[in-house]
Amino acid sequence: MSDVLFPDLPGLEWDLSKKPIFNTKIMESVNGRELRASYQAVPKYEISLSFGFLRESKGKNELQQLESFFLERRGAFHSFLFKMPDDCDYTCSYSGDGSTTSFQLYKQMHTSVIPLAHTKAETVFEVDPTFWNENDNQQFWSDNDDDLFWDDTTAQVTKSGMVTLSKPLKQGHKFEVKGTYYYRCRFADDEQQYTNFMSKLWKANKVEMIGSLGNKV
């Protein structure tokens, strides 16, 4: 398992597909009633993509990048990180409780919330919490003379899907974090086909992966 990124190549076509998969054991009795057991809380994904062109001329070595990446992973053996187009950005909102400094980043999909295990690390940045407290009864000022009028809290996003604050936010104060997440993937098979359709031009009609937003696949 490594954190190397799948190559970002311009020949990637729009017909990328993903299929969420769960693991459910279903036992059926003679009268037709079923007993079901779920062995997987977070789905894995079957991901399929294709490259309409892979150039091998004028300083471009796109075929070599893709093929060598596959070889270095030993086919389906080693995993890697994949930034899926149009499915890689998160926006997370949190409320302070006066004590918590670490928060789990997540992907919001309509009513579903999926924890993220692989995110782009961000160095220290300033948190900009909402100015008004969600508690209407909270007084505007502080009785503590050492409290600043502005908030000087900073935050850092780790590569493991956590955001850490330099100090706890006050009860009810909210803040928002935006960034990039990755899928943990492996190749679906131990083989991959490339087609030479013109001089110095290749294509890969199908590159298939098994992926997850969790830490392992």
Where do the model's predicted regions map?
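Solvent-exposed edge beta-strands and adjacent loop segments
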Residues: M1-F70, Y183-W202
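Extended beta-strand solenoid/passenger and fiber regions
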Residues: Q64-T153, G179-V217
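A generic structural signal for beta-strand entry/edge sites
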Residues: K44-E46, T100-S102, S160-M162
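Secondary-structure transition/turn motif
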Residues: G52-F53, Y106-H110, L165-Q171, S212-L213
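Short, hydrophobic/aromatic-enriched beta-strand segments in well-ordered soluble domains
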Residues: F51, H173-Y181
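A surface-exposed beta-strand-loop module
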Residues: W150-H173
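Surface-exposed coil/turn segments at beta-strand junctions on protein surfaces, enriched
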Residues: Q40-V42, G98, T158, P168-K170, ...
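Beta-strand-rich interaction surfaces with strong enrichment in secreted/lumenal proteins
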Residues: R36-A37, C92-S93, L165-K167
